[in-house]
C-alpha cells in the first residue's frame, strides 16, 4: 500500500524557504519526495538551503524573488509552471518583522514596509499559484504562515499583527471560493520559533526568563517542527481539510 504522505511527482513552492519555518517546510517536503522550489531574496542563503535540501535526493530549485514586487511574483510563478507544468502546493511563508517606536509614532513608510511583504506579497503569491492550480485542473494546496500576533495585541507591532490577521482571513476566503476547483487553503499560526527574524530576541536572558516559562513544552520552536504539517497539508492525507487555522506553538497560546 502506498503511503498517503508520498509526495513523489509533487511540485511544491515555498516562499522564504531558505531559513526558519520556510526551510522546515521545504525540508519535510523534500524528504518525502517532492520537487521543491524555494524563493528568497538572499542568493547565498538560497544556495545553502538548496544544497542541504538536495541531500534528500530530489530536485530542488532556488530562485531570487521579492514577493512584494508583483511583477517579480508573476514572472517567477510563470517560470515554475513553465518548467514543471504544475504547482501542487504553495507555502506562502515569506515575511518581515515589524517594530515601531510606538503606535502613534509609526510612520507611513514603516506601515507599508511590513504590509508590502507580509500581506501584499502573500496576496500576489497566492493569487498566481491559485490561477495555476485552477488552470492545470487538478487543484492544489495553499498554506499561509500566520502568527499569534493575529490574535493577541503586540505593542508597537500593529502593522505586523494586522498583516498576520489578514492572512487568516485571506486563507479562509480562498478556501471557500476555490474549493470547487480542488484548491484547499489553510493557515498555520506559529508560536515562538527560532529564525533569523526572531532569534536575536529569543536568545536574550531577559526575554527567555519572561516568555519561555509560559511555553508548556519549555523550548522554542524550530524549523523542523513544521516539517510534518507541511507534508500533511501538501499530501492527499489532507484532501478534506481546508479553511482551517492550525496552531503550532508548544502550547503557548493555551496557557
Regions found by a protein language model. Name each.
Residues 11, 18-19, 42:
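Conserved glycine-rich cofactor-binding loop
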Residues 126, 163, 171:
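Active-site helix of classical SDR
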Residues 43, 64-76, 108, 225:
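The beta1-alpha1 cofactor-binding region of Rossmann-like NAD(H)/NADP(H)-dependent oxidoreductases
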Residues 2-4, 97-100, 152, 217, ...:
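Short C-terminal tail/terminal secondary-structure segment
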